[in-house]
């Protein structure tokens, strides 16, 4: 085997071991700063740390759903039901 072929074979075998600039995350930290993420979470649904949770802001005290958007029912004797749309389930309040 010629020297050139041997060098090409060695380079091809070592190519998977090489690291490139495109390996790993393009933006360190995932692209969304945690301060912005927590602020958006507080504005949408509140959290325990801010003291503005939906349960405290809901006048009836009855909420439906555990994932955003969480609904505030009109009355406390309502119950939650899930209805299926085309691609996902949506919580609704059913009041007798």
Curated annotation (Swiss-Prot):
Contains 4 disulfide bonds. The keyword Translocase does not apply. Expressed by the venom duct. It comes from the Eukaryota. Residues 1-20 form the signal peptide. Residues 21-57 form a propeptide. GO terms for molecular function: toxin activity. One of its GO terms (cellular component) is extracellular region. It is found in: Secreted. Keywords: Cleavage on pair of basic residues, Disulfide bond, Secreted, Signal, Toxin. Belongs to the conotoxin N superfamily. The cysteine framework is XV (C-C-CC-C-C-C-C). This is Conotoxin Mr15.1. It comes from Conus marmoreus (Marble cone).
